[in-house]
Amino acid sequence: MILLDYSAVAIASMMISLKLEGEKLTDFFALHMILNSIRTSNKRFKREFGKMVICCDHERNWRKESFQYYKYKRNKDKKNSDVDWNLIYKCLDFVQDEIDKGFPYLVVEVPNAEADDIIGALGTYATEIKEPTVIVSNDKDFVQLHSEYVCQYRPCESAFTRHPNPKLHLKELILRGDGDDGIPNIKTADDHFTIEGKRQKSMYQKDLDVWLYDDELSFLTDETKENYYRNERLIDLSFTPEDIRSEAVVKYKICKVRPNKPKMTQFFMKNKLRNLHEKINDFM
């Protein structure tokens, strides 16, 4: 299967075109970039990996409810940005709805879940049933899912990746935290990224070289123990609530794809996407 990190991949391609190619953000541009990112992935991977699953974010997510500072800085930066994020999200929702009506892909969205949770559940399931699978995403968090059957394609690098030791990589992520998601390293307090210009407490490579291989976690102090478990809960995809994981797999199993080429044509023509309609077979 092809697991597409829907909004993240589409937004990344938009940002590249906006910054490097000087494109102007309009409804037409956003629709084109969203659909073209889907078309490109489908054309590139369908023969080897089969059907595509569009993995979507729900408007609410359990991590934000569990950790109030989750993606705090990212959300703040968006509010202060010149980019019309409302337009982007409106177009993402619109395309998601249209895909469900006639495009030949599975759309999986689960209440209170991010696309990460869906990819985590289906990536784990793919390894269990030994189904060759590619995760299309730039996100380093998905390295933990790599296996004999699951690899990752990073569009930003135009390259496949399969980490030789996903568990070790995951542990390093937990120790270092994830600044992009507002998760500090294990030496740093929860609210660190809410304070402009403040530096995290240093993580020294000589310590990491020891800690990574300490399965007993004996290096944890009272100060860092709670922070380690905080990061583990937010980064390790096996900590996704079981009801979300189960629902994602069930939706994958029961979802029926009903491609409807006439409806796809109607959609392209109505939205003046003639250039994509000329490549309609790439979507099939």
Where are these regions (language model features)?
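Extended two-metal-dependent nuclease catalytic cores across DNA- and RNA-processing enzymes
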Residues: 20, 48-49, 76-267, 271-283
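Domain-level signal for Mg2+-assisted phosphodiester chemistry and nucleotide/NA-binding surfaces
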Residues: 1-97
